[in-house]
Design a protein with these regions (language model features):
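Eukaryotic scaffold/interaction segments
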Residues: 1-636
Length: 636
């Protein structure tokens, strides 16, 4: 018979023939006497010579002769007396508590009805961490008592199954007509009231304390017999307190959860004293697994949810900020040392509790902001040193920001499992410190300029250029003043294009395409126009030289002209006209005449401030080639 026998448990029934219809051959008193003797034989496991048909007929005839009350009450009293005798013989001798201990334990657990529990029950019962040496010796006695209870329970269930078969007619006719409990349910209630909740002996107190001590000792590292605990659990689940609750949920579970809460409150205090977050979380993780395994092995599955909430609240929820701020293994330390496995454990555990990720993200956000401010302050100190070029500062600042972003992205992906709330915290902090640097738009533009300028080590490596531009865009997204960035970018692009320093047209267009994705067509319209002007200028210049060759005209110098659309370029009109040297004037006039034939009505305005000239100068025996501005050419 299973120890966790539920009510109305399906059992194998003996085949019974219908009783023969005949008059009473024996008196009512004799029938009851024989039936009572048969029940006694069943209770003593001496059934080899019993006739189920005969005794079924006795019960049948007693019901027909209106003796159902006498029969039902007699069976109830006989079962009760048997349970009292069995309890005195089998349980009382193996009580694990003395009379004084039982009285003290009962007082400690008083008030447990309806969930109203003392907040110091575990302390009164000696069930707090550190008391293992005192309770480990009680394990064998507790095991003997619990085993005796389950053995008596198994014996009772076996007897009740056979008694129910004999009294099947009682269940079929008498019970529903008189609103009595079925024989099986009667037996369970009698076991509950006569044994488990006996008012004669402190069986309930011994049972609860033994169960609690076994669990406590296992928590402290001892090995206990889980099968026995499981058997007691099944028994208590089979016994009903009322229509909604079992004895397990009414008597055992509240006191178990209450003492568990006290235990882990004390355990958390002990672990916090170590000031080692990694050790704390490893211990918490181990405790969670132990409690899960214990429920799976020997407690009710319904206990898991409230138990889990208690352990998580005591070990995590109530100490989130303390764990995060620990000097050894706190989140800041883990981030600084890039301890991703430990951060993954922290994230995984903090995610279990409602406010865990909020607390973690608060520290994460502050960490990223603080590290970003350090980057900004370092750059600010460099900017005060006039010997540090802006481009060098920009490269340093953007590289540090990119390195920080890359490291945090790695932490987000591996340790925080791509959690959206963690990602939002990182992005918010990045946004904050990047925009605290008022030169961020300029630095990002300079960084891009350094990679797109011809002759730099970055522009020469075309395979590595695209990933760099992609990473730069991730920083650009955080910039609030994108109009400021556009102004700097146009200025740097102008220099690259007009001074023939752009690495390639494809690279320029790729970068502008990325900006278009981020900010839309209107944002890059003028930038695209600048590139188109340069392409059209090449075509116009080729046509100009071809015309000169065809006409056999030669110029006093080689002239290269870029025709720019004024609205696209960051160019101011010259305030005063410039006086070019005669040779330059002749070349300019020739170009204007040619351009007018192709674009009649358009007016060209020369911008000497943007031009350069290659000049060969003879100094005695040495010749020098100079690259000078147009204004310098005019002076020379």
């Amino acid at each position: 018979m299973s120890t966790g026998a539920p009510r109305r448990l399906g059992v194998r029934h003996h085949k019974l023939r219908a009783p023969r219809k005949h008059g009473l051959s024996v008196s009512v008193e004799e029938m009851w006497s024989r039936l009572s003797a048969a029940i006694a034989q069943i209770q003593h496991h001496n059934i080899s010579k019993l006739s189920y048909e005969e005794h079924y007929r006795y019960a049948y005839n007693l019901i027909l002769n209106q003796q159902g009350d006498m029969l039902y009450q007699g069976v109830q009293l006989q079962i009760q007396e048997h349970l009292v005798n069995q309890s005195d013989m089998r349980l009382t001798p193996v009580f694990s508590l003395s009379i004084e201990e039982a009285q003290a334990a009962s007082q400690a657990m008083s008030g447990s009805d309806k969930g109203k529990l003392r907040d110091n029950t575990a302390r009164l019962l000696g069930l707090l961490p550190g008391n293992a040496e005192a309770l480990f010796p009680t394990i064998p006695a507790g095991e003997r008592f619990l085993s005796a209870v389950t053995a008596m329970w198994d014996d009772h269930c076996s007897c009740m199954s056979k008694i129910r078969d004999v009294l099947k007619y009682v269940d079929r006719v008498y019970v529903p007509n008189h609103r009595r409990e079925p024989i099986w349910d009667l037996g369970l209630d009698l076991f509950r009231d006569t044994v488990v909740r006996s008012t004669r002996v402190p069986c309930r107190t011994n049972l609860l304390v033994a169960m609690l001590r076994q669990v406590y000792c296992e928590r402290e590292g001892a090995t206990v017999e889980r099968r026995t605990i499981k058997a007691v659990t099944d028994m208590l689940l089979s016994l009903l307190h009322d229509a909604k609750q079992s004895v397990y949920t009414h008597d055992f579970e509240p006191i178990f959860l209450s003492t568990t809460s006290e235990y882990y409150a004390t355990e958390a205090t002990r672990l916090l004293e170590s000031q080692r977050a990694t050790y704390y979380l490893q211990s918490a993780e181990r405790r969670f697994a132990e409690e899960q395994a214990r429920v799976d092995a020997c407690l009710s599955p319904n206990t898991l949810a409230p138990l889990k909430e208690i352990v998580e609240r005591r070990l995590l929820t109530e100490h989130l900020d303390e764990i995060l701020a620990m000097p050894d293994g706190g989140l800041v330390v883990l981030l600084d040392t890039d301890a991703r496995a430990d951060m993954e454990r922290m994230y995984r555990l903090f995610r279990l509790v409602p406010t865990g990720l909020d607390a973690l993200n608060k520290v994460l956000r502050a960490y990223v902001t603080d590290r970003g401010k350090i980057i900004n302050e370092t750059t600010l100190c460099e900017s005060k040193n006039t010997q540090t070029p802006s481009a060098e500062m920009a490269m340093s600042w953007v590289n540090q920001v990119l390195n920080t972003k890359s490291r945090l992205d790695g932490v987000l992906a591996t340790s925080f499992q791509g959690d959206k709330s963690c990602e939002a915290a990182i992005n918010e902090a990045m946004d904050t410190f990047i925009n605290l640097n008022t030169r961020a738009p300029e630095f990002i533009s300079l960084y891009i300029d350094e990679h797109l300028r011809k002759g730099t080590r970055f522009a020469d490596d075309t395979t590595a250029l695209e990933p760099v531009l992609d990473k730069t865009i991730t920083i650009f997204r955080y910039v609030h003043e994108k109009d400021v960035f556009e102004r700097y970018y146009k200025m740097h692009l102008t220099r690259r294009l007009l001074h023939n320093r752009s690495a390639s047209d494809d690279a320029e267009r790729s970068m502008i395409a990325k900006l278009k994705v981020e900010c839309g067509h209107g944002y890059v319209q003028k930038l695209q126009g600048m590139l188109n002007d340069m392409k059209l200028s090449e075509e116009v210049l080729r046509a100009f030289h071809h015309t000169l060759e065809r006409e056999g005209t030669s110029l006093p110098l080689q002239l290269n002209v870029n025709v720019l659309t004024a609205t696209y370029w960051p160019i101011a009109s010259p305030k005063e006209p410039s006086i070019f040297p005669p040779a330059l004037t002749e070349a300019c006039n020739a170009f204007e005449k040619f351009y007018d034939t192709r674009h009649r009505g358009r007016v060209l305005t020369w911008q000497p401030s943007l031009g350069t000239a290659d000049v060969r100068v003879q100094f005695k025996s040495r010749t020098h080639e100079l690259v000078v501005s147009t204004y310098a050419l005019m002076v020379l």
